């Protein structure tokens, strides 16, 4: 990370006020090159005196520095009044909708925001005597298949066109690799990404899986992904957001993707 990036990250890390956090969180969600989303962001943040500076600072960050900062600022936003948190969620919905097409990563950002800001709660966790994933009930395996199929739109690669809702060939291969351990027990469903309701239902089922089994699932996702080469930023962000939603630590291969940016600068 060069001095310009370090300075921008340090400035953004000083933000604490509701309006500043509001603007920075939204800026971190902007899709690269989207003029519609940028106009929507400017409309949402027009009252902030230093709006241009916030956008410039965010623009100076590397892609793999954005999600860790997003998580930090969102945690601070949780300490703001309920009206401020609700205003951020409403603004997020408008900015995300400005393009007319919602990216898969946008859906994960949205779910993570609702959970971190206290708008939704994880499902109650079941107990388990082992971390072995082969012992999971059929309902959990079905949820793994559904959620993994959703991730396959981003991991290990994305489709070139946002309109294409099907996973890439690499995504299909990754899905098959993740689901292979259960193939001996039952037929594995095809890689069919769920809609938003199905995604939320699958996530809630996974959140109820025992705490010692969730890290094993996350490791399976990451280990299958790195077989295709170094993680790209979208794939890494999708997996990191999933770790957060499942309250699971980052596997080393995933932590490495972010380790040379945010943590060292703010240590």
Locations of the language-model features?
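Small-residue-enriched hydrophobic alpha-helices in membranes
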Residues: 1-97, 101-267
